[in-house]
Amino acid sequence: MLMQSIYLSKIREQNPLIHNITNIVAANFSANGLLALGASPLMSANVEEMQEVPKISQALVINIGTLIGKDREAMLQAGKTANEVGIPVVLDPVGVGATSYRRETIRELLAEVKFALIRGNAGELAAIAGETWQAKGVDAGQGEVDLKAVAEKVAQRYGCTVLISGAVDIVSDGTQTATVHNGTSLFPKVTASGCLLSAVCAAFLAVSEGNYFSATLEACVAYTIAGECAAQGLTTQVGQFQIRLLDELAALSPETIGQRGRINE
């Protein structure tokens, strides 16, 4: 099924400011990816700023990849402030199943903050859903569960949209579910490629006027198409792929999304 691009042009027109509380591995890549797409990144995790920064932003990303110092406190404060001013909040629960501290952090965030989108790999979403899964650190790992059912369960439980990233991406808001069949096997070879997808989703949500399911679906299609284009002619050249991905995000057009997007609903 083909899709019509609605939000990419709005990102380029509105240049939304995306507040990222992200990990030290992903910060540079996420910031440059947002710039390439047409959004503006703001990378701040200083707890003393968290009552102000969300008020000047159009979306917030909370990424727990490298929890350091007062990050947890900053995430909670930023999330609450974002909820107060009504901007969408994206949660990337990196490696949530790996340690008790990560699990406790996610439990507290989900209890205290209303999220528009939870974006993670299969292992991370299975952990949030309470399903058995053999995660490998912050990587997806392996398991034998129905991932569509996991996405729907988490979406219904927390009243949000869910995106499970993988060879086939799953998007659900608990009532409607779609799968995205674009992408490349090089994505898992580049660290923070999933973190950048979360930031890209935030940019799409920022201009969506509350239509979070359709915005997440288009964000996923757009990003995975950019990955396909970046991977053309490459096999193991992951360094070139990373640079090309930024180039393809900048070159991406609504027409390309409409022509190349492969989704099932």
Swiss-Prot record:
Organism: Haemophilus influenzae (strain ATCC 51907 / DSM 11121 / KW20 / Rd)
InterPro entries in the record: Hyethyz_kinase, Ribokinase-like
Binding site for substrate: 43, 192
Gene3D superfamilies: 3.40.1190.20
Transmembrane domains' residue ranges: none
HAMAP family named among the record's database cross-references: Thz_kinase
Catalytic activity, as annotated: 5-(2-hydroxyethyl)-4-methylthiazole + ATP = 4-methyl-5-(2-phosphooxyethyl)-thiazole + ADP + H(+)
Domain of life where this protein originates: Bacteria
GO annotation, biological process: thiamine biosynthetic process; thiamine diphosphate biosynthetic process
Source organism phylogeny: Bacteria, Pseudomonadati, Pseudomonadota, Gammaproteobacteria, Pasteurellales
Cofactor requirement: Mg(2+)
SUPFAM superfamilies in alphabetical order: Ribokinase-like (SSF53613)
Keyword terms: ATP-binding, Kinase, Magnesium, Metal-binding, Nucleotide-binding, Thiamine biosynthesis, Transferase
Its job: Catalyzes the phosphorylation of the hydroxyl group of 4-methyl-5-beta-hydroxyethylthiazole (THZ).
Keyword set includes Secreted: no
UniProt-recorded Gene Ontology molecular function terms: ATP binding; hydroxyethylthiazole kinase activity; magnesium ion binding
Family statement: Belongs to the Thz kinase family.
Binding site for ATP: 119, 165
Pathway stated in the Swiss-Prot or TrEMBL entry: Cofactor biosynthesis; thiamine diphosphate biosynthesis; 4-methyl-5-(2-phosphoethyl)-thiazole from 5-(2-hydroxyethyl)-4-methylthiazole: step 1/1
Keyword Kinase: yes
Gene: thiM
Record protein name field: Hydroxyethylthiazole kinase
E.C. number(s) listed in UniProt: 2.7.1.50
